[in-house]
């Protein structure tokens, strides 16, 4: 009789308890994944607001693919090695060459953004 009682009452009880524990695992996993994504979005918004408050201009719509395309379009075959000045040397030549390169890259970026 006790064996029959276990089959009728105990087995369904254990099946429900263990089955629901297994099923709740998936519901909780969805909750934790959603919380993680939401937290990352909040952190990203906080970072953007801090950067704009500090005066940095952020580009909108920047993706990994767009950055890869920019890097792939760079002319890496024709470049000039510029040695950085030492502490005892004059910085005027270095600053002049550096400014010329920055102006050239700024013009290229403006042309690409206008197209």
Curated annotation (Swiss-Prot):
Instruction: Supply the alphabetized keyword list.
Output: Membrane, Mitochondrion, Mitochondrion inner membrane, Transmembrane, Transmembrane helix
Question: Biological process (GO) annotations?
Answer: mitochondrial cytochrome c oxidase assembly
Q: Which residues lie on this side of the membrane: Mitochondrial matrix?
A: 1-6
Write down the membrane topology: Single-pass membrane protein
Q: Does the keyword Membrane apply?
A: yes
What residues form the membrane-spanning segments? Answer: 7-29
Function statement: Required for the assembly of the mitochondrial respiratory chain complex IV (CIV), also known as cytochrome c oxidase.
Which family does the entry's similarity section mention? Belongs to the COX16 family.
Its name, as the record gives it, is Cytochrome c oxidase assembly protein COX16 homolog, mitochondrial
Q: Which organism is it from?
A: Caenorhabditis elegans
Name the gene.
cox-16
